[in-house]
A protein has these predicted regions:
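The feature marks helicase ATPase cores and/or their adjacent C-terminal helical subdomains
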Residues: 1-195
């Protein structure tokens, strides 16, 4: 890729240096980015399981595992894994009828990813959600929750405690609940990406 980019710059088809491209949000979070073999295998395993469960459900089969935890050390590519999985689900015909959301408790990441959806077929800004956004919509078939270890409870809400309690009330949950409880209440299946 580096050689190709250098050639494109020499021919004046590309303006920016490769380093600038590699540091751009579109490059960092693109589902077209080459995945590691482990990431690819994880996506394929999850996708095949979802496909089978979806097919079984169409024929009256019961729903299976509601919660799946995908864990890894910080910086191992869980965010790109979740984005790539969402992109695949939204763009493959077998599962494209499912209502899927990408949840992040980090406002800056939510804003960045919402901007990027304009460049990614099948994705819309409303697909990228905060934990409270999830509670304001109809039920989801699947929620992919990035940075799930950052989801909060009433003790971590500070000045947002009233909104937190209002959300719990709206969902019929006790005030001692947490944002993970919100996620479970609002979807059939959750994938929690944890450090």
């Amino acid at each position: 890729f580096r050689d190709l980019w250098t050639k494109l710059r020499e021919e004046n088809y590309a303006i920016h240096p490769i380093e600038e491209l590699e540091n751009s949000d579109l490059f960092k979070f693109s589902p077209f980015k080459t995945l590691t073999p482990d990431q690819y295998e994880t996506i394929e395993t999850i996708y095949k399981r979802l496909e089978q469960e979806h097919e079984d459900a169409k024929h009256g089969g019961s729903k299976r595992e509601r919660i799946t935890v995908v864990s890894g050390a910080p910086g191992t590519g869980k965010t790109i894994l979740a984005i790539s999985l969402m992109f695949k689900i939204k763009n493959e015909p077998n599962l494209s009828d499912l209502r899927v959301g990408f949840v992040t408790p980090m406002d800056s990441l939510k804003k960045t990813l919402r901007k990027l959806t304009h460049f990614l077929p099948g994705l819309k800004p409303c697909d990228i959600l905060s934990p409270s956004d999830v509670t304001k919509n109809d039920r989801y078939d699947i929620l992919l929750v990035d940075e799930a270890h950052r989801l909060g409870n009433y003790l971590s809400m500070g000045s947002g405690i009233k909104a937190f309690y209002n959300t719990c009330d709206r969902l019929g949950l006790p005030h001692t609940s947490n944002q993970v409880d919100w996620i479970f209440k609002c979807c059939d299946k959750a994938y929690l990406f944890y450090d």
